[in-house]
Amino acid sequence: MTPPALTPRLLLRAYALGIFPMAESRDDPEIHWVDPRRRGIFPLDGFHISRSLARRIRRMDWTVTVNEDFAGTVRACADRDDTWINPTIFRLYVGLHALGHAHSLEVREGDALVGGVYGVTLGRAFFGESMFSRRTDASKVALAFLIDRLRAGGFTLFDTQFLTPHLASLGAIEIPRADYHRRLGEALAGKAEFAPPGYSPDPASVVQRSSQTS
């Protein structure tokens, strides 16, 4: 029996079940489905902005954009020696972006992408897929602006898939699979906006709101 074709809509169904895809490498055509025993999440009221990062954000000469170069952001995330983003995964997420279920946040120095993050939205859940940094702290700046946006839009779950030391230093935690699936079910029952009406963040307000909630 031939398995169903892997499409963006089928991918959304997998996310709703708490499963996400990965490839072993960019050259591996196979897709593996993952449901970790322990899951990384970012409590949206627990993002830690250090004093040095707060200064960087307040004084930065970078600009932050949203959904202006989704494909470029995914390519930049894959531009490393080892990556799980193969051509099939790239195609699927570009398809999700066209459906309005995948978004990018870019950090720019002039016209150049120097940092960014992308992920999938479903209900009140945001599934962070990957991020990149071509300048010191650029990915941290992207996360700060992303989390501020998720809070403003009514999101309740930020899934980081795995917990890395870098994410842990910024406030991410690890929870058991059963706890994750409970939180996911609650998030899927609601609705959130990645582009909430009237939301227009500036660097100082992002730092201020983060210090009030963390």
Curated annotation (Swiss-Prot):
SUPFAM superfamilies: Acyl-CoA N-acyltransferases (Nat). Gene3D superfamilies: Leucyl/phenylalanyl-tRNA-protein transferase, C-terminal domain. Its EC number is 2.3.2.6. GO terms for cellular component: cytoplasm. It catalyses: N-terminal L-lysyl-[protein] + L-leucyl-tRNA(Leu) = N-terminal L-leucyl-L-lysyl-[protein] + tRNA(Leu) + H(+); N-terminal L-arginyl-[protein] + L-leucyl-tRNA(Leu) = N-terminal L-leucyl-L-arginyl-[protein] + tRNA(Leu) + H(+); L-phenylalanyl-tRNA(Phe) + an N-terminal L-alpha-aminoacyl-[protein] = an N-terminal L-phenylalanyl-L-alpha-aminoacyl-[protein] + tRNA(Phe). The keyword Cytoplasm applies. The keyword Acyltransferase applies. Its main location: cytoplasm. Functions in the N-end rule pathway of protein degradation where it conjugates Leu, Phe and, less efficiently, Met from aminoacyl-tRNAs to the N-termini of proteins containing an N-terminal arginine or lysine. Belongs to the L/F-transferase family. PANTHER family: LEUCYL/PHENYLALANYL-TRNA--PROTEIN TRANSFERASE, LEUCYL_PHENYLALANYL-TRNA--PROTEIN TRANSFERASE. This is Leucyl/phenylalanyl-tRNA--protein transferase.
